Structures are given as C-alpha cells and as structure tokens.
Curated annotation (Swiss-Prot):
Its main location: membrane. Belongs to the LpxH family. This is UDP-2,3-diacylglucosamine hydrolase. Binds 2 Mn(2+) ions per subunit in a binuclear metal center. NCBIfam families: lipid_A_lpxH, PRK05340.1. Keywords: Cell inner membrane, Cell membrane, Hydrolase, Lipid A biosynthesis, Lipid biosynthesis, Lipid metabolism, Manganese, Membrane, Metal-binding. It comes from Coxiella burnetii (strain RSA 493 / Nine Mile phase I). Pfam families: Metallophos. Gene3D superfamilies: 3.60.21.10. Its cofactor is Mn(2+).
Amino acid sequence: MRHTLFISDLHLEEKTPSITAHFLYFLKHQAPKADAIYILGDFFEAWIGDDNQTPFNRKIIESLQTLARTKPTYFMRGNRDFLIGQRFAAMTGVSLLEDPSVIQLYNKPVLLMHGDSLCTLDHKHQAYRRKIMKPWVQKLMLSLPLSLRRKLAKKFREQSRRHNRTLSYEIKDVTPEEVNRVMKEQNVELLIHGHTHRPAIHDLTINGNPTKRIVLGAWHHGGSVLRYAQDGSFELQAFKIDL
C-alpha cells in the first residue's frame, strides 16, 4: 500500500558510525518504497553552517541528494541543526519545512513539529530557543570562523547534557496543555513530532474529538520510523541491522 515515512532525531555525527549505517540501510531498503520522506529535526548531532563541508557531511549530503532525486524529501530543522539553510537544501534537493507546518497527508491535515517548543516546563531551553531562532543571532553565528563555531557547538552540547541530567522526567517531556493549545490553534486531529526520544502513540481528546499525538523515536540503538499508509493506518517501526 502507498505510504509515507517520517524520521527524526538521528543525531548523525562521524563518531557514531552505527547510526550512519542504519540511515544508509533505511535509504536503500525502506525509503525507495515510500511516496515521500519527512525528516523532523535533529538529523545531525550538530550543524554549524552549510559551509562546513567535512568529508562526513558531504557523504550525508550526497546520500540525501540521491534520495531526493527520486522521492520528495522534506526537512524540518531541530534544535541541534537549526543552522541548516538554503544552501543545504540546494545541495541535497530537500524541501525545507518551517516548524510548525501543517501538511495534507492523503487528504488529512497533519501538524508536524520538531517538538522542543512543546516542552514548555523546560524554561532554560525555551529561553535558549527564543534566542537561537532569531534571524540576526543566526546570521551572527554564521559570520564567525568555522573553528570558533566548532568550539561553540561543543560547548553548547556539553551544557545541554549537563542541563538535561538535572531535569525530571516530566520537565523533559511535552506539556499536555501546550499540545492541546497548538492542536486547537492549527485545527488538526493528528500531531507528529520528535525531540523527546520517547516513541509512542498517544490518544487524546480535544474539544470532544478524538485526536492522536505520534512521537518519533531516536536512533541511538537502531532505526526508528513512522510508516503512515494511504488508508490512514500507521505504525512505529524499529529496526536493527548486523554491523
């Protein structure tokens, strides 16, 4: 049956070859069968600018380029790869999506988000997010030498890890009230997002109507894909390959 695939939170980087291998397997064996592929943020562990053309980054860009030649491929930036820009889109052939975006998925309106904006109890991250999403801040960051951007990215990741270790389970998750607010505002019955690394299908009720929130999984222990079929059925699928 015709279907569309959704992935997020691969956190690709050179020092995790297992994740890269799972992504390349996904491109070869799963993506070619889909109508379209949506990547909902944190595809890279860190992205410091489209001008950072390392051998590893070029390898991933070329793999996306091969995919996008034959399949519509959509890319939403996350909190780890928010500096991805139009040059990256031109090099890969992907179409960039704003966060949030409402798409028509087999004639059904579906809200797509990365998901970090839903975690409103994490006040420190929300303050950080408001800063880094300002165009002038991004322009300033991209004007810095690559060597300095690498150091800053490393510093930000270390700070993020330390911060996350101090948070409770509830604070690191989405806020139900914010989910309800956003879904009401966008007038949708289905929300798909990543970020929290807690793959699940949540049944909700909004304005008396049954709704669903699908959370995509991270790729630290294998591949994680949402398969959404033309008839409205869907499944979160995990897979592992022998390395």
